[in-house]
């Protein structure tokens, strides 16, 4: 494990996104104190801010005083690839990518096609892609009232059905309305003696992808998120714990650091399918050694190129089920710095 990770990658743990819901569940079900150093509570509100990585927040902490001054802060790592579909699946299932099988923004589905895990284009049945009970479903079965608050269009999305199923879904009509979100969160939190209310906030990530995380628009949205957190802290009932985290951070990519595979030295030779995302490519091929050698030669120090079997052996994705192995690339290209492919 160490030889692969030492080059560029941080090993997951000791606390990961996969551990978060089970950590709250320990207190909610009476199985023991909350894990990960979280406070014990009978009600948790769990706010997931898409795209608000630790380094991004630290850079603009002066714009988010409420977030910056929250107590009991702990570092969590996300498994690779650090992308929304994979990280939300880790959170919702309480499992690692090698188990839940949502291994990127796009990846090779069991059907053999490249599927998009956010839009679910070319996706197989969500319950087939991810058949295991989710962490939310396990809490519901244990008698915990679990609610999910987010945009209405996500209620029956493929990703929700695969990895976030189980909670009662409460749609948000106006994503910019702090009062609506706080009101619905309070109502959901009070709906059971033991409750977990999951609140998904996506706009910071949306702005970051469109404008960049150092843009004025991103900074403005971070201030809005901080306002939302402050409003929740002001209104939540005593004994209710607010847990805030992100699913990944963001890196701005300069135009001249975007590698176009069609224009670079035969990178597509012997490649059957190319999936993943610009910072973490799954490359599917019957000739992994030759393809990896070619990609290393062309990309140089712009990316770390590894054989998929080596990454699996290094436990990069956690233990990998036989049923999910074919979804990971035969070769992986993991960009360095601010490069993208």
Kindly give the residue locations of the regions a language model identified.
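Feature captures the catalytic ectodomains and active-site-proximal regions of enzymes
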Residues: 1-341
